Regions:
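Mixed-charge interfacial surface used for oligomerization/domain docking
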Residues: 68, 93-179
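Solvent-exposed alpha-helices and their adjacent loops that cap or buttress functional pockets
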Residues: 22-25, 50-52, 133-137, 178
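Catalytic-loop motifs flanking and including active-site residues across diverse enzymes
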Residues: 12, 81-85, 164
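Glycine-rich oxoanion-binding loops at beta->alpha junctions
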Residues: 1-26, 170-175
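General beta-strand structural signal in soluble alpha/beta enzymes
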Residues: 1-9, 31-33, 58-61, 101-105, ...
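Alpha-helix capping and helix-loop boundary segments enriched in small/acidic/polar residues
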Residues: 3-14, 34-38, 72-80, 159
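Active-site histidine-anchored catalytic micro-motif
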Residues: 24-26, 38-45, 52-101, 108-115
Length: 179
């Protein structure tokens, strides 16, 4: 079960808690949360409500975007890696693993994934047309711009897709210490 907020916004804690109640089939609930301020606040509120209601719950936070953690402070944003994480956790649950086992598998995967974004134009809000970012009409691209193009990445001259993939793959492999 997924709890979603308005476009480009996190759901509120009550909505997340309501989704947790729907998901609870007697074996416990794993709350997977992206590492964004709004999602974290909603998750924290929902966890408090769930614990108060006596639900068996665990939480795993995803934060794998390597570009947004320049100081190694473990504040990486959660991105597309969460999709694979949902499937991995669900597969473990379908195999009959306990909530603690599913949470441990999800936590291990979450700590060993990396992603990075690349944008060549600014994103725009579909309802009001507002631009996210100030890349504008340039010959630059931004590596590490976030899932909505919020910015915070590194701007570099536009490259071919082959060169861009090579740059991104090298950064991901270095972050994961792959050879």
């Amino acid at each position: 079960v997924q709890a979603v907020g308005d476009i480009f916004a996190a759901p509120n804690g009550q909505l997340v808690f309501d989704a947790m109640k729907l998901a609870d089939k007697g074996h416990g609930v794993l709350l997977l949360t992206l590492n964004y301020a709004g999602d974290q606040l909603a998750g924290k509120q929902a966890m408090k409500l769930a614990q108060k209601a006596g639900l068996n719950v665990r939480q795993v936070v995803t934060g794998e975007e390597i570009q947004f953690d320049p100081n190694g402070e473990d504040n990486k944003r959660g991105l597309a890696g969460a999709v694979a994480l949902y499937h991995i956790a669900a597969a473990a649950a379908r195999e009959g693993k306990s909530l603690d086992e599913v949470a441990e598998i999800a936590e291990r995967y979450a700590k060993n994934m990396a992603s990075i974004t690349v944008k060549s134009t600014d994103a725009t809000h579909p309802q009001n047309g507002m631009s996210f970012g100030d890349l504008g009409e340039t010959d630059l691209m931004e590596i590490g711009a976030g899932q909505h193009g919020e910015g915070g990445g590194v701007r570099v001259p536009m490259k071919s897709s082959k060169e861009t993939v090579a740059t991104v793959a090298e950064a991901l492999c270095r972050n994961l210490e792959l050879k």
